[in-house]
Amino acid sequence: MADALVGYEKEAGCVPILHPEEIKPQSHYNHGYNESRKSHVDDYSTWDIVKATQYGIFERCRELVEAGYDVRQPDKENVTLLHWAAINNRVDLVKYYISKGAIVDQLGGDLNSTPLHWATRQGHLSMVVQLMKYGADPSLIDGEGCSCVHLAAQFGHTSIVAYLIAKGQDVDMMDQNGMTPLMWAAYRTHSVDPTRLLLTFNVSVNLGDKYHKNTALHWAVLAGNTTVISLLLEANANVDAQNIKGETPLDLAKQRKNVWMINHLQEARQAKGYDSPSYLKRLKMDKEFRQKVMLGTPFLVIWLVGFIADLDIDSWLIKGVMYAVMWLVVQFLSKSFFDHSMHSALPLGIYLATKFWMYITWFYWFWNDLPFVTIHLPFLLNSLALFYNFGKSWKSDPGIIKASEEQKKKTIVELAETGSLDLSIFCSTCLIRKPIRSKHCAVCNRCIAKFDHHCPWVGNCVGSGNHRYFMGYLFFLLCMICWMMYGCICYWRIHCATSYTKDGFWIYITQIATCSPWMFWMFLNSVFHFMWVAVLIMCQLYQIAVLGITTNERMNARRYKHFKVTATSIESPFNHGCMRNLIDFFELRCCGLLRPVPIDWTSQYTIEYDQTSGSGYQLV
C-alpha cells in the first residue's frame, strides 16, 4: 500500500528540471484507496489503524484511538493517519483525528509533504476545503519545493487552483525552483484548463523560471502543448523572450521541427512587427484591416455579379473572363486576409451588403414607378423599425454576466465550501457561477444569460438582453424582403416585355433575366434571404411559444437535468403555455390588461421562481 503511494508521490513534483527535453508530461493516476478497491471482508476487527484509515472504516479507527493509539504517530514510512485519510478523501476521519489532536500541517512521506499536499495531488477538493478550514497552510512547500497551487496546476486540478487563488494564494507564486503555476500548467497539462483559469486571474505570462529563465511559452513549446501555446499567444505572451541560453520559443520549436508551432510563432512575431514584413505582409497581420476586408468583400462580390451581368455586352466570353478575374480577386483576398473570424464576419458582411444594394435598387429603380403613400411610406417606416431592431440586436448587451474580482473569488469559495464547485455550473473563463439557462459563448468569449445562440448575421449573441429585438429584426427583415420582391415584379411589369400567360414560366424567367440582369440578381438574393429568415422566425416562434425553450436548450436538452427528454418531445420547466410564454417573452402589457412575469436571468440559478398561476393575463 505504502509503496503504491510513494510511487504516486514521485510521479510529478517541483524538482529542478535540469534537462527539459528529457522529461515528458506524465498522466495523473489515482493511487489512493477508495470504496471500489475495498476487498470484501466481513470482519475488520483484525485490521490495523493504517489500513482501516485507508479504507475509511470509521468504527475500527475510533476503537483503536480510544484504546490509546496516538493519532500523531507516523507509521514506519513516516506517514501519519491524517495523510492517509487526506489522500483517500476520508472527511469524517480527518475531522475525528484533528479533534483528537492530529497536527494539520504535519510533514510526512518521502517528499516531506503535508496532508494538504496529498489531498491536492489526488484532486480531492472537498478534502482541501476541509483541511484549510482547520488551518492547513497551502503556501507550505514540500521536500521538492512545491506548494499546493503548483501541485494543483501541474496535475490539472482546475477547481483546486481556483479555490486556492480565491483564498489568497498568489497567482504568480514561485516554487523553490522559480516555477509558477502557469509554467507547470503549460508544461504538464495538455488542456485549456487550468491555464485558461490562470490567465483569467491576470497571471504574469512573461515571467522566467529560476534555472532556465524559460517563460510559460518556452515550457509549452518544450512540451509540445499546442493548446496552451494558442492560449498564451492570445494572451500576448512575449514570443521574443530569451532563456538563459538566448533561445526564444521559436528557436525551441525549430529544434523540435514542429511545423504547427513554428508557423504559429512566426505569425505571432509578424503580427507584432518583429520580422519587418513587407507592406502587404503588415496588412495581412493587421487584425482590424482583415476584419474590414472580410466585411467589405461581400459588398464587392454582390455588386460585381450583378454589374457584369448587366453590362451591355453581347459577348458572354468577355463576361466570363470578367467573372474569372473577379473570382481570382476574391481568392486572393480570402487567402490573404480571411482568418478564423470569417465565420462571424462574412455572414454579417453578406447581410449588410445585400441590404445596401437592395436599398440602392429601391431608391434608384423603384422610386419613380411606385406610389409613395401606399408603397414607399410603409417601406420607409418598416426600414426604420428594421434598422432599430438590427442595431439593438447587434450592439446591445445580450445578457453578459458580469462580476467584480472580489465577487468572483467569493463565488469560488462559496461553491467550493458547499461542495458545488463543478465546471458544469462554474465557468473557468469568466470565473462566475453560471445561472440556469446561461452558456459561455466560444465566439464572444463571455457567459450569456438565457443564451439562445450566437448569430453571425447580427454579429452578436442572442440572449436575455436582446432576444426580443432579434425577433423584431427577423420580422421587419422579412417584411422588407417581401417589399423588395414586390418591387422587382412591378419593375418587370412596367419595363419588360413579358408573356407569362402565353409562353409559360421558363420563357418568362429568361425574359426578365435578359430584360434587367441586375434586377433578376436582386430578386434571387431576396428569395434566398426570404427562405432562411422565414424558416428561422418560424423555428424561433415555435420554441418561444410552444416549447418554452431556447435554441441552445433544444440542441443540448439531454445535457441539462431539468429537461425531460423523450424520443419525440422535450418537456421544459420553463413552458407555461403558449399565451403565457408569449406574454412573458415579449413583455406584453396591453395597457395593464396583461401582466408578464419579469425574471432577471443573469442571477437566476434554479428553476424555482415566482411564476403566478393562470393563463398569463389578467383583466383589471
UniProtKB/Swiss-Prot annotation:
EC number in record: 2.3.1.225, 2.3.1.-
Catalytic center residues: 455 (s-palmitoyl cysteine intermediate)
GO molecular function: protein-cysteine S-myristoyltransferase activity; protein-cysteine S-palmitoyltransferase activity; protein-cysteine S-stearoyltransferase activity
Annotated TM spans: 293-313, 314-334, 346-366, 370-390, 470-490, 505-524
UniProt modification remark: Autopalmitoylated.
Domain notes: The DHHC domain is required for palmitoyltransferase activity.
Cytoplasmic side of membrane: 1-292, 335-345, 391-469, 525-620
Protein name: Palmitoyltransferase ZDHHC17
Result of knocking out the encoding gene: Morpholino knockdown of the protein does not apparently affect embryo development. However, the motility of morphants is markedly reduced from 3 days post-fertilization onwards. This is associated with a significant defect in the axonal outgrowth of spinal motor neurons without affecting neuron generation.
Highest taxon listed in the record's lineage: Eukaryota
Enzyme class: transferase
The keyword Nucleotide-binding belongs to this UniProt entry's keyword annotation: no
GO biological process, one term: habituation
ANK repeats mapped onto the chain: 77-106, 111-140, 144-173, 177-207, 212-241, 245-274
Alphabetized InterPro entries for the sequence: Ankyrin_rpt, Ankyrin_rpt-contain_sf, Palmitoyltrfase_DHHC
Chain's role: Palmitoyltransferase that catalyzes the addition of palmitate onto various protein substrates and is involved in a variety of cellular processes. Has no stringent fatty acid selectivity and in addition to palmitate can also transfer onto target proteins myristate from tetradecanoyl-CoA and stearate from octadecanoyl-CoA. Plays a role in axonogenesis.
Principal location listed in the UniProt entry: Golgi
Pfam families to which the protein is assigned, alphabetical: Ank_2, DHHC
Catalytic activity: L-cysteinyl-[protein] + hexadecanoyl-CoA = S-hexadecanoyl-L-cysteinyl-[protein] + CoA; L-cysteinyl-[protein] + tetradecanoyl-CoA = S-tetradecanoyl-L-cysteinyl-[protein] + CoA; L-cysteinyl-[protein] + octadecanoyl-CoA = S-octadecanoyl-L-cysteinyl-[protein] + CoA
Keywords (A to Z) from UniProt: Acyltransferase, ANK repeat, Cell membrane, Cell projection, Cytoplasmic vesicle, Golgi apparatus, Lipoprotein, Membrane, Palmitate, Repeat, Synapse, Transferase, Transmembrane, Transmembrane helix
Family: Belongs to the DHHC palmitoyltransferase family. AKR/ZDHHC17 subfamily.
One CC-aspect GO term: presynaptic membrane
Residue spans, topological domain Lumenal: 367-369, 491-504
Compartment(s) of residence: Golgi apparatus membrane; Cytoplasmic vesicle membrane; Presynaptic cell membrane
Domain named DHHC: residues: 425-475
Membrane topology type: Multi-pass membrane protein
